Amino acid sequence: MAGLAATFGSGAMTNSIVEAEKADLFFIIGTNTTSQHPLIGSRIINAKERGAKIILADPRKIQLADYADIHLRHNIGTDVALLNGMMNIIIEEGIYDRQYVEERTENLDQLKAVVSRYTTRVVEQITGVPVSDLEGAARAYATTGKAMLFYAMGITQHATGTDNVKTCANLAMLTGHVGRPSTGVNPLRGQNNVQGACDMGALPNVFSGYQQVANEEVRKKFERAWGVEKLDGKVGLTITKMMAAAQKGDLRSLYIMGENPMLSDPDSSHIELALSNLDFLVVQDIFMSETALLADVVLPATSFAETAGTYTNTERRVQMAHKAIDPPGSARDDWDIICEVSRRSGYPMSYRSTADILKEINELTPSYAGITRERLTKGFGLQWPCPNEEHPGTPYLHKDKFTKGLGSFLPCDFKPVSEVPDEEYGFLLTTGRIYYHYHTGTMTRRISILEREAPEPLVEINPDDAKRLGIRNNDEVELISRRGSIKVKAEVTDRVPERVVFSTFHFHEAPVNLLTNPVFDPDSGIPEYKGCAVKVRRCA
């Protein structure tokens, strides 16, 4: 979210899911929407059937490619060059929204200076996208009435992820596609409450509502509310930095909740070394994950069906969840476990229920001030910002002005993936998810119908590459990077271009993150899961 926060002043989806029904055009980049957000994907397809256009930017031939009017099949990691090329065309042809840019943005001259270097021929050379497709996409996006841009981890899980998001924002502002219904820049979050977790300060630099820990007045407000003194104003560590610190011995203990870094973090052999080097590891989860098996203490938590509270979804909508069944054994709600640990550590917390916690959120978090329990029980949720109990919620952001005032063009230059294929490691591995499984499979691989549909890991390889290497469907192949190797069955398919292979991180039998590169975006701390150099060989 660092890219949107820098350009717009707010790091969240600008518009609402339902607005897809009235969009004229969708620009979809770095999101396999029908597989990873299928309900949103269905809305996009329904809109297409009513006449909307789709521009898809994805190196793989995903399902949405069958519906796309233009498929920009760019080389992995060349998103900035692609977007800069589109903006250069839009500026050169004078089809940007001059009034919007003059009244609502700043730094246009800096943007022009950077994108002018991205001529159609230069961009074609970098991205592999034909000039005609680039021009068609630029003109369609700039001249349509209402265009929604959707993105996800396909552009954020790069060492240049923040640059990618800034450049998406630049394109949307240049064409006036922000601050109106059925427009905007819309990140699709990777889990059902990841937006809510970020909103509540599960980040190293903020309290709830993105109130900076470095701000002394903010700290004083929370000190008064919590009855403590001298809250630390130092920004903490991201996950990747935590693991590096643990490996060096600078971090001695970790408390991990609902996370399985043994499968989900890059270069996972070093993750095991880091966790094993801790003096004390606590894992709070609903199943014995690969990470929980390394813990000194495992605290059994409740699943979504066994607890009450709220979720904040990808469109900033806060919704009430009600307990459906009792938890098994000694499992307890996450918040209740935290309160008990805090009490035993010498700081009693007085929350008696999730209602008490939400009341404190209302008092301390301005964007949630009007999202009360009473209001949530009467409807289908409220979208922040909702500053008071009379406010209806905000379906789309930046209507009259950006959160930061003027939207800032923050031009970026193209940088290649950190690990470029070479003579020894001749393929680029990109990773992601499939329709039937979720993240590290801790939950979905325990569901028989999903295991039936996707029982084993596969690696997608292009038919021409497969023929050259003597690989056929279902042959066992070995993927080798500079960090490790795995064996997996091949799926020969033109979904991937030549010299690219794709696999998922759902399967502990073939932990693909043994291979991935632990470099990360300097602003967001997100690792580069979407591109690392590997060699591929057929097993005997």
Task: Kindly give the residue locations of the regions a language model identified.
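Extracellular/periplasmic loop regions
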Residues: Q195-C198
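Acidic, glycine-rich segments within the central catalytic cores of soluble metabolic enzymes
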Residues: V206, Y210
